[in-house]
């Protein structure tokens, strides 16, 4: 196997390098730019409107003249007139569709709204904060405009103002600013957001407010380019350790997503999460009744097992594999895929960890998904199988062969994903090398299922590594010039060698349902 192919796997002489490479190579699977939790939100709540207002009436066309009058009135020395004007600006920004954010920014009202945050009137502060929240919910340029107007230091001051409505709206606004990316996240952290934010995690805070606080914590954890500093993570983790016990499903979902983002920050962050002793609370959430909780928990524990073997073992010791049958058979294909990804990282561990997968009885399910799953799930299953051929013992590989892995494995050679083709070819090559005296039986099965034809065709593939490996397999194992069982690199006995011998198959064949 060429060195660049070895780097795809996370278990070889340079195991940890392989883990990192494996994770880099499959970023499209679960560490892509898609957002599982919403990073920005607008406040369009109309419950505080007067009874005389009809909140269900759709807004009319944008009135530029009204905006001009509103901006002028917002600078009035009459407190009542000013409050009405700021409230009108907020209403313009609280429409369900296409709020005129750019029009309001262009009108020059931003500095006025920011100045209102320093008012002694909580109602004016609240309305201004609401308007700014919705402006900051827009594009990066619109969020930048709010920051440039000097809103962030004032929002941070308002976190200690004592008025819960103003505090909550300020938290919401800061959440939108932080959610724009790591630059604004770090800016808010430098200005000291953490301690005043975390003080709201207490039993006296209304549930809606606590949901917003938890959502802001998610945004603080979200970005990884760069990831939050270790000092920030250590400060946040005690709060997450409390929130993971909360009975509110929305808070629980955001808490687990926050942990999933932290565990996506590398082995150091993974270790901090482990030391916070939340893993034993994370793992049972894989069986939660809410699929959103399951999804977030699966991502979090999946990120942890991309770490070291020791970090992986802690998750295994928490009983995670007992949840895998339900996740692998889940009605949502996305969960199937992520569950197989999780297993692929276990099969890339040490030999005992590979054996744990077999002992859990889930290898037949992996092979079934390799055969019948959607293509993203099949790709993850191909990784899981190939990792066994590198990490596992020959008897474990033999068990996969007995479970019928070769036909669906060879079928993946017809896909258009060059990386997966290479992964499968490596796996086939490894299986044949381990087979020893049983290599002839394995080659016969590969030929019967059409795998040989596919390998022969791949000798013409445009990818150099693929066509060279295809040629190598044909030359070593399917050439009439050689005795199949005696080729260089093959084990001298059937799936044996200098590793523990393969136990005899029991009557009726192997049973991995236990």
From Swiss-Prot:
GO BP: embryo development ending in birth or egg hatching; female gamete generation; gamete generation; meiosis I; nematode larval development; NLS-bearing protein import into nucleus; nuclear pore organization; oogenesis
Pfam families: Arm, Arm_3, IBB
Region Disordered: start-end pairs: 1-62, 485-514
Gene Ontology cellular-component annotations: cytoplasm; nuclear envelope; nuclear pore; nucleoplasm; nucleus
Any one GO molecular-function label of the UniProt entry: DNA-binding transcription factor binding
Domain IBB: 1-51
Cell compartment(s), UniProt: Cytoplasm; Nucleus
Main location (coarse class): cytoplasm
Gene3D superfamilies: Importin-alpha, importin-beta-binding domain, Leucine-rich Repeat Variant
Known tissue expression: Expressed in larval and adult germline and somatic tissues, including neurons.
ARM repeat windows: 101-142, 143-187, 188-226, 227-271, 272-311, 312-353, 354-393, 394-436
Keywords: Cytoplasm, Developmental protein, Nucleus, Protein transport, Repeat, Transport
Bias (Basic and acidic residues) ranges: 12-39
Phenotype upon loss of function: Larval lethality. Mechanosensory neurons are born and develop normally. However, cre-mediated knockdown targeted to mechanosensory neurons severely impairs axon regrowth of mechanosensory PLM neurons after injury.
Assembly behavior: Forms a complex with an importin beta subunit. May interact with transcription factor cebp-1 (via N-terminus). Interacts with cmk-1; affinity for cmk-1 is increased in the presence of Ca(2+) and calmodulin and leads to increased nuclear accumulation of cmk-1 in FLP neurons upon prolonged heat activation.
Similarity comment: Belongs to the importin alpha family.
Its biological purpose: Binds specifically and directly to substrates containing either a simple or bipartite NLS motif. Promotes docking of import substrates to the nuclear envelope. Seems to act as a cytosolic receptor for both simple and bipartite NLS motifs. Necessary for correct nucleoporin localization within the germline. Essential gene for embryonic and larval development. May be dispensable for axon development, but required for axon regeneration in both mechanosensory and motor neurons. Required for oogenic development, ima-1 and ima-2 cannot functionally compensate for loss of ima-3.
Protein's recorded name: Importin subunit alpha-3
Species per Swiss-Prot/TrEMBL record: Caenorhabditis elegans
Gene name of this polypeptide: ima-3
């Amino acid at each position: 196997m060429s060195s660049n192919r070895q780097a795809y796997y996370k278990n070889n002489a340079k195991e940890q390098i392989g883990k990192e490479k494996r994770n880099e190579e499959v970023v499209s699977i679960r560490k892509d730019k898609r957002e599982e939790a919403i990073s920005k939100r607008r406040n369009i709540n109309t419950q505080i409107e007067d009874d005389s207002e009809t909140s269900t009436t759709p807004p009319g066309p944008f009135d530029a003249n009204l905006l001009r009058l509103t901006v002028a009135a917002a600078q009035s020395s009459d407190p009542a007139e000013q409050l009405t004007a700021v409230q009108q600006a907020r209403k313009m920004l609280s429409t369900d569709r296409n709020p005129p954010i750019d029009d309001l920014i262009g009108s020059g009202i931003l500095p006025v709204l920011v100045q209102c945050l320093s008012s002694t009137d909580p109602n004016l502060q609240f309305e201004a904060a609401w308007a700014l929240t919705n402006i900051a919910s827009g594009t990066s340029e619109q969020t930048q405009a709010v920051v440039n107007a000097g809103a962030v230091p004032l929002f941070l001051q308002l976190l200690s103002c004592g008025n819960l409505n103003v505090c909550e709206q300020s938290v919401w606004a800061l959440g939108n600013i932080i959610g724009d990316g790591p630059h604004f996240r770090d800016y808010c952290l430098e200005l000291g957001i953490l301690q005043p934010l975390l003080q709201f995690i207490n039993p006296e805070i209304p549930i809606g407010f606590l949901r917003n606080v938890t959502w802001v914590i998610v945004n603080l954890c979200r970005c990884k380019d760069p990831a939050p500093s270790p000092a920030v993570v250590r400060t946040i983790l005690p709060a997450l350790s409390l929130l993971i016990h909360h009975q509110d499903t929305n808070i629980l979902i955001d808490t687990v997503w926050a942990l999933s983002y932290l565990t996506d920050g590398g082995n150091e962050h993974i270790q901090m999460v482990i030391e916070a002793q939340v893993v034993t609370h994370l793992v049972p959430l894989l069986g939660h009744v809410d699929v959103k909780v399951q999804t977030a928990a699966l991502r979090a524990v999946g990120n942890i097992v991309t770490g070291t073997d020791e970090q992986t073992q802690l998750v295994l010791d928490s009983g995670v594999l007992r949840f895998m049958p339900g996740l692998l058979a889940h009605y949502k294909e996305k969960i199937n895929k992520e569950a197989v990804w999780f297993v692929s990282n276990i099969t890339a561990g040490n030999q005992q960890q590979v054996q744990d997968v077999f002992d859990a009885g889930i290898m037949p399910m992996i092979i079934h998904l390799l055969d019948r799953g959607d293509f993203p799930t099949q790709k993850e299953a191909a990784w899981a199988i190939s990792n066994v051929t590198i990490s596992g013992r020959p008897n474990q590989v033999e068990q996969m062969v007995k479970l019928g892995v070769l036909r669906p494995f060879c079928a993946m050679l017809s896909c258009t994903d060059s990386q997966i083709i290479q992964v499968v070819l490596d796996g086939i090559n490894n299986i044949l090398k381990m087979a020893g005296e049983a290599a002839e039986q394995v080659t016969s099965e590969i030929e019967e299922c059409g795998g040989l034809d596919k390998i022969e065709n791949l000798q013409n593939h445009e990818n150099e590594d693929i066509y060279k490996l295809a040629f190598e397999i044909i030359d070593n194992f399917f050439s009439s010039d050689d005795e199949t069982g005696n080729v260089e690199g093959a084990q001298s006995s059937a799936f044996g060698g200098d590793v523990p011998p393969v136990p005899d198959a029991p009557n009726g064949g192997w049973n991995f349902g236990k």
